[in-house]
Amino acid sequence: MTEARRSVYFISDRTGITAEALGHSLLTQFSIDFEQRTIPFVDTEEKAAQVVEQLNVASQRSGLRPIVFSTVVDAEVRRVLQTTDAVLFDFFDTFIAPLEQELRMPSSHVIGRSHGVVDNNMYDVRIDAMNYALNHDDGAVTHHYSRADVILTAVSRSGKTPTCIYLALQYGIYAANYPLTQDDLNRGKLPRKLVEHKRKLYGLTINVDRLQTIRSGRLPNSDYASLRQCSYEVARAEALFRSEGIPYVNTTTMSIEEIATKIIHEAKLERRLY
């Protein structure tokens, strides 16, 4: 008989992004395969009652109490959720109340402050940074590099594009990326377009076997994906980084979030979004 998986619910009065982020940061500490579900826009007592019923049914069917992470703000809605048989982790109760006491002032209790368009200026920064990342992807446009906060450079399929997009969306950082081509690697020198922006460069590298796996998924049985080619490109790229004094990080075992955080810290970048 198959053992039931523990159910986890992320409940929010908005998108559920914050509940997911906070919950995942805790769940990753346990080597368990959770069955996860997000229930957004629980912003009325009626909706909360429906959620409670759903949680209680899930508990009865599996014999295991669901684990619930909630970022619901409204006090009445939260009171309804607290009647569930599930294990409820209410981030509002856990963090806001102690903060109110320490700061000696009540919180705003405004729904959606962390992800809603509360500050139009911050929204514009995020969109502008995102557009910059997309327009300056893979060396497509280089004449606006003077505006970049950072320029990621690496061989193909090392994680440049997703890292730039994450830096833009999460931190409002203007991130461009430039691919190191076969000619660049053969010369062993920085491409001319990057020389004047050397102080903004940050390199990415990757383990050869991982790079081969990624490239084989895209172009199987090609020279581009061969072990020989991948080994050559990685070795030459790392040698170039060292000779030019360009900081770099191996992305093989790192998440996009970890890569971005390391770049911000080591390159001393100033984030525009919090």
Swiss-Prot record:
Reaction(s) catalysed (UniProt annotation): [pyruvate, water dikinase] + ADP = [pyruvate, water dikinase]-phosphate + AMP + H(+); [pyruvate, water dikinase]-phosphate + phosphate + H(+) = [pyruvate, water dikinase] + diphosphate
Enzyme class: transferase
EC number, as in UniProt: 2.7.11.33, 2.7.4.28
Keyword terms of this UniProt record: Kinase, Nucleotide-binding, Serine/threonine-protein kinase, Transferase
Sequence positions that bind ADP: A154, V155, S156, R157, S158, G159, K160, T161
Pfam family, one: Kinase-PPPase
InterPro entries found in the cross-reference section: Kinase-pyrophosphorylase, PSRP
Annotated family: Belongs to the pyruvate, phosphate/water dikinase regulatory protein family. PSRP subfamily.
Annotated function: Bifunctional serine/threonine kinase and phosphorylase involved in the regulation of the phosphoenolpyruvate synthase (PEPS) by catalyzing its phosphorylation/dephosphorylation.
PANTHER family with a match to the protein in the record: PYRUVATE, PHOSPHATE DIKINASE REGULATORY PROTEIN 1, CHLOROPLASTIC (PTHR31756:SF3)
Protein name, per record: Putative phosphoenolpyruvate synthase regulatory protein
Species of the source: Alkalilimnicola ehrlichii (strain ATCC BAA-1101 / DSM 17681 / MLHE-1)
